[in-house]
């Protein structure tokens, strides 16, 4: 990756594999924005992953619970914590790397109008055997206390309507341009120019 900012659509990616790829890239100096974090997948059935998260929720400082560890419920923060664990975040280099990273639920402006990419080596369909169980991160987050799944879903529905309208307009415009260029190439002027060797 060697673009100013790369926007990754996290839908149907495996959490750990995507996190490792992003960690490597931000350490190399690449700015990355991750959208649709709630649509990430984790291998394994929902109930087992929920038990693992509840095991994590029990971990706390013995004498003062406010000192951490902090149990983030939002999908964006769960992904952030996975990436942070793969970066030496206490050094200046690690802090600078994490500042190059932004993670969002849904696709907020202005990233709804930017080109989004996927990470093939982290896609569930290419990495998980067909028929194996997997968990959606948004569902897991909601089960442990994340309150904004419905809000994000509502905003995503609105965005998809706008996106469909834009795509329909773009297709119509492309069709007009191609038909006009085809008509122009078949015109008498083009034939005359061809006769003169142009």
UniProtKB/Swiss-Prot annotation:
N-terminally acetylated by acetyltransferase NatA. One of its GO terms (cellular component) is cytosolic large ribosomal subunit. Its main location: cytoplasm. GO terms for biological process: cytoplasmic translation; maturation of LSU-rRNA; negative regulation of translation. InterPro entries: Ribosomal_uL13 (IPR005822), Ribosomal_uL13_CS (IPR023563), Ribosomal_uL13_euk/arc (IPR005755), Ribosomal_uL13_sf (IPR036899). The modification Phosphoserine is found at residues 43, 181, 185, 187. Gene3D superfamilies: 1.20.5.4280, Ribosomal protein L13. There is a cross-link at residue 176 (Glycyl lysine isopeptide (Lys-Gly) (interchain with G-Cter in ubiquitin)). It is found in: Cytoplasm. GO terms for molecular function: mRNA binding; RNA binding; structural constituent of ribosome. Component of the large ribosomal subunit (LSU). Mature yeast ribosomes consist of a small (40S) and a large (60S) subunit. The 40S small subunit contains 1 molecule of ribosomal RNA (18S rRNA) and 33 different proteins (encoded by 57 genes). The large 60S subunit contains 3 rRNA molecules (25S, 5.8S and 5S rRNA) and 46 different proteins (encoded by 81 genes). There are 2 genes for uL13 in yeast. Component of the ribosome, a large ribonucleoprotein complex responsible for the synthesis of proteins in the cell. The small ribosomal subunit (SSU) binds messenger RNAs (mRNAs) and translates the encoded message by selecting cognate aminoacyl-transfer RNA (tRNA) molecules. The large subunit (LSU) contains the ribosomal catalytic site termed the peptidyl transferase center (PTC), which catalyzes the formation of peptide bonds, thereby polymerizing the amino acids delivered by tRNAs into a polypeptide chain. Belongs to the universal ribosomal protein uL13 family. NCBIfam families: L13_A_E. This is Large ribosomal subunit protein uL13B. It comes from Saccharomyces cerevisiae (strain ATCC 204508 / S288c) (Baker's yeast). The lineage of its organism: Eukaryota, Fungi, Dikarya, Ascomycota, Saccharomycotina.
């Amino acid at each position: 990756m060697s673009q100013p900012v790369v926007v990754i659509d996290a839908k149907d990616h495996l959490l750990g594999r995507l996190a490792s790829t992003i960690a490597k890239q931000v350490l190399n100096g690449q700015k990355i924005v991750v959208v649709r974090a709630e649509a990430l997948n984790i291998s394994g059935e929902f109930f087992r992953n929920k038990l693992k998260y509840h095991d994590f929720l029990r971990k706390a400082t013995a004498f003062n619970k406010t000192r951490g560890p902090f149990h983030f419920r939002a999908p964006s923060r769960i992904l952030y914590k996975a990436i942070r664990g793969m970066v030496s975040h206490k050094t200046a280099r690690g802090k600078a790397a994490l500042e190059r990273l932004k993670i969002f639920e849904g696709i907020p402006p202005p990233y709804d109008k930017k080109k989004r990419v996927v990470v093939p080596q982290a896609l569930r369909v290419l990495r998980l055997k067909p028929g194996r169980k997997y968990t959606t991160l948004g569902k897991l987050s909601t089960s442990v206390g994340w309150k904004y799944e419905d809000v994000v879903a509502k905003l995503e529905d609105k965005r998809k309507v706008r996106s469909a309208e834009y795509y329909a307009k773009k297709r119509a415009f492309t069709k007009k341009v191609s038909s006009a260029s085809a008509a122009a190439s078949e015109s008498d002027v083009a034939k005359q120019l061809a006769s003169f060797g142009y």
